[in-house]
Structure formats: structure tokens, C-alpha cells
Amino acid sequence: HETSVQWLESYQAPGEVKIEAQATADNLAMLVEGNRVYNTDSESVARIAHVDIVETEAGETITARGQLTGQLLADRVVMATENVTNVEAGMYSLYSKNRRGLPLEIAASEGYTETTETEITWDAVLDGVTTLAEASGLGFKVLFNPETGVETYKVYRGIDRSDEDSPDYVGYFGQDVGNIQNITLTTGATNYKNVAVVAGAGEGADRAVRIVSLGNVSGEVRREMFG
């Protein structure tokens, strides 16, 4: 029953979601503040934080907005000063020492060796984790297991797809790579010119004129400009 789902994930931030749907009884029951929405493609889950119900001539619609559950880290404060050297360990430690009842489990360490000399003091855990991620190039996310209902906070190293010489390079947009959903192609020749009439100094018959064209064009397809 949804009319639009916008699911934005970020490498070094929780990410957000916006769902627009008809205000059916089922949608009104499901899209309420605090409920979770699961993305089967990325194994991530969002928590609904804000709901709008609008009545129009076409009927009632509901718009639900939320953040991916990594946003829960913003609800805890680092209750001391943390001096971080190993980034992965620090990103886990900031959460584990200040968890205080949050439901996110902690993934096993991958043994990443990125280091820093960073002091985190009395920030939100999310701010501290983001600082370490941006300083090191590591990212973080929360994965959801639909069989157990467990959400797991994980630090990970992303794949650089910007290097054209790398086999992981993905440098184009297309439906096959999932970064374009709808394609609109527009053609037209409103301002198109393919022949330039270039005049030099002088007056009348003494003025030098040259014609430059894109190919051998004539008739209606010949479009001249003066310059």
C-alpha cells in the first residue's frame, strides 16, 4: 500500500527513511512512532520517529519518517574521557561502556589496524563514533536478524569503488547497479546549431566570411548561427 519509500543509508552516519502511503487501517496500525521497518536488501532496520497524516481530496495519506537504528547511539552520553588509539576498538568501546540498556548487540571485531590519537569527552556516543569513523575511513551500521530479532552494531571497512583501475570500480549510474529507479530521456533541437557563419573585419564585399559546419548538412537540418 505504499506510494513512495525513500531509504537512505550512509557509510559514516545512521541514515534515514521516509515512507508515504495510503492511510489504510493496516498502514495506520504499522506506521506508528517507535515501530521498526526492515529492509531485506541491506539487512538494516529503521525506527519510525515522526508520523504525519494528511487528508486531501484524493483521501488520507500517511507520511512516516525515521532513522536507521544506529541513531540510538545518539541517546547515550560518553560518561568519561576516552583516549582512543585503535579506531575499531574505540568505536566499540564507546558504545559498550555507555550502553545502559540499549538493545544493540556488538559484532565480533574484524581486527582492523587503523589508528588515531583522539580524545572523546562527554559527547553523545554517536558523535564520538562518527568522529572516529571520519578520522579513519571506517564505517558503521546496524544489522538486523529477522529470525532472532537481534540488532547488531558493526564497524566495517567499505569497498572503494571510485578507483577506475580497481575491479570493484562502479562509476556509472544505472538500474542494474541500483542507483537509478526511474529514467526519463528527453530529446530536442530547440537551441541546436550545426553551422557557424564567421565574419572578420571589414565592410561589405571586403569583409572576410568563413563558414564552418558539423558535417555536410543542408535543408531543414541545417541550422545556422552568426558569430
Predicted region positions:
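Juxtamembrane "anchor/assembly" segments of surface/extracellular structural proteins
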Residues: 1-29, 67-71, 221-227
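Short, ordered beta-strand-loop transition motifs
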Residues: 7-15, 51-62, 143-149
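Terminal peptide-recognition signature
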Residues: 19, 132, 198
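Structured loops at beta-to-helix junctions and adjacent beta-edge loops in soluble globular domains
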Residues: 22, 51, 67-69, 156-158, ...
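Short coil-to-beta transition motif at edge beta-strands of beta-rich domains
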Residues: 27-38
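Short beta-strand and beta-hairpin "edge-sheet" elements
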Residues: 37-66, 141, 178
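Charged- and aromatic-enriched interaction segments used to assemble
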Residues: 61, 65-189
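Acidic, small/polar-enriched beta strand-loop surface segments
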Residues: 161-227
